[in-house]
């Protein structure tokens, strides 16, 4: 089994070099594929001998055992990529994953905040404190640009141009995009850079735009805790929250105000338009609710 796990590490190294996948994705693949190797081992199977029926049985067992459909989809993606790699590297003469059936994924609408709720969230930080001034700037940038949290905390000083009012983002797959900041976000960035960031750095020289209290790069988890803190202050139900709550609000509110779907796709950094289209369902649902509330024949 050690050889099997070593082969998985070789595959993950190759995947990182070819696709530049995020560390979180690689770690998830490692967990899924290690579980698969153990599952095969208990049945007297290996990566060299497993057949399509065996892999389909694994996926079915995961689903029946309460595995979420999204987790099963990720497992399937990892399995397919692994066996494609093994076939390409001549370790196998076939690809048993080629005809595996995909689990049906329920279409989950993004958690959505109204414009009034977003406004309350943005007003929650106390701007006379350097730490909360940083958070205020981060929230404003997040809502103005629709960045992923990982993209936001990874920003450097060289990524922003306040004169041009844009931010350069390196997104998934190492793809670069330029996103407008808007006047409000530029104002709060200027204020933070003058009155907040120097206090946080306390003489330390780093290029990170939004450093932590220890003058290091902030983690996604830390910022998520900050968002929850301000949501409580703003009186927002925790069930409406997710780490990407302002990214979702950014997309939905743009569409509500008539933005073109492809423009929103470009701003979000989605490679596939279908990923962006889910936000149209949120916007349509909001219109349906308003119609029911206000139309005399609804």
From Swiss-Prot:
Signal peptide coordinates: none
Gene3D superfamilies: 1.10.150.130, Intergrase catalytic core
Gene Ontology biological process: cell division; chromosome segregation; DNA transposition
SUPFAM superfamilies assigned to the protein according to its UniProt record, in alphabetical order: DNA breaking-rejoining enzymes (SSF56349), lambda integrase-like, N-terminal domain (SSF47823)
Any single Pfam family the record assigns to this protein: Phage_int_SAM_1
Subcellular localization(s) per the UniProt record: Cytoplasm
Catalytic center residues: 148, 172, 244, 247, 270, 279 (o-(3'-phospho-dna)-tyrosine intermediate)
The entry's keywords: Cell cycle, Cell division, Chromosome partition, Cytoplasm, DNA integration, DNA recombination, DNA-binding
Record's keyword annotation contains Transcription: no
Stretches assigned to the Core-binding (CB) domain: 2-87
Any one Gene Ontology molecular-function term assigned to this protein's record: tyrosine-based site-specific recombinase activity
Ways its activity is controlled: FtsK may regulate the catalytic switch between XerC and XerD in the heterotetrameric complex during the two steps of the recombination process.
Ranges of residues in domain Tyr recombinase: 108-292
Cellular component annotations (GO), alphabetically ordered: cytoplasm
Family: Belongs to the 'phage' integrase family. XerD subfamily.
Subunit and interaction comment: Forms a cyclic heterotetrameric complex composed of two molecules of XerC and two molecules of XerD, in which XerC interacts with XerD via its C-terminal region, XerD interacts with XerC via its C-terminal region and so on.
Protein name listed in UniProt: Tyrosine recombinase XerD
Organism name: Shigella flexneri
Gene that encodes it: xerD
